[in-house]
């Protein structure tokens, strides 16, 4: 409740900032809101915003990127505070208020029709991802519920990876083309890594199951990962907020992931609002990627699908995913 309350405040604050900062960010956040509406997973929205701002950034160029960066920076700042996690979910929650504002942002995006329409087209294309991601999300949520503690471990990874993703967010765009290749590699490698992770640990099994599910879900993995991360991130966040004590399974894991979450995101925003654009997306991705594999593959592939739209986000992450998968294969899955 505190987390959600704070996230409500945070969500209100950043959004207030968003419209005040830019109707463009609102355009994209409006798209993201549309994504949120469509996604109900802020992660997908963010992925939507990422692919929106990725493709929109392709269309709107720096504008969507700037808006995403702004929102990403805001989110990334909040996420640096770990608020983005709450905020992302808060955004998920606020997606309604975000929808309101986002509708304003949508109207704004409509005001910027080219952007707005590209936003909508992206949001729609993302919406397809969202929808597929939503189905996958539900599947993965069920798997999540099954995997329970896997969330936390995965979230740790997600945090870590989201960190790498923040860092790599810059490179996502560069390697968007790579993403698909890597993404496929992930999918191939990741089941392997999933098995390896299974070998590595029961977490691995969980991660593996989720990841394998992710493999299928991976194109939607971002969506799944995001929604799962949301739930997972919600749990770890709450646990992080609650001291992750209730998460006795991995209070350290969730706490560390919270700390990591906070730490890397702080560097990420400091690194770049671009990484925040991606990290904002990736924050969403992180949230979504509570499974690092999902994040990596999820944001990679989900963003990969959306990142196929975003062209980028997951690309480097996909490389990372491959690398991580190699690490996972090395059983350094918890190499963080």
UniProtKB/Swiss-Prot annotation:
Homology family: Belongs to the S100-fused protein family.
Biased composition (Basic and acidic residues): 100-120, 163-176, 184-195
Chain intervals with Low complexity compositional bias: 16-26, 40-66, 73-98, 285-311
Record's protein name: Filaggrin
Subcellular location: Cytoplasmic granule
Gene name of the encoded protein: Flg
Organism: Mus musculus
Disulfide bonds: none
Source taxon at top rank: Eukaryota
Tissue specificity note: Expressed in the granular layer of the epidermis (at protein level). Expressed in the epidermis of the ear (at protein level).
Function: Aggregates keratin intermediate filaments and promotes disulfide-bond formation among the intermediate filaments during terminal differentiation of mammalian epidermis.
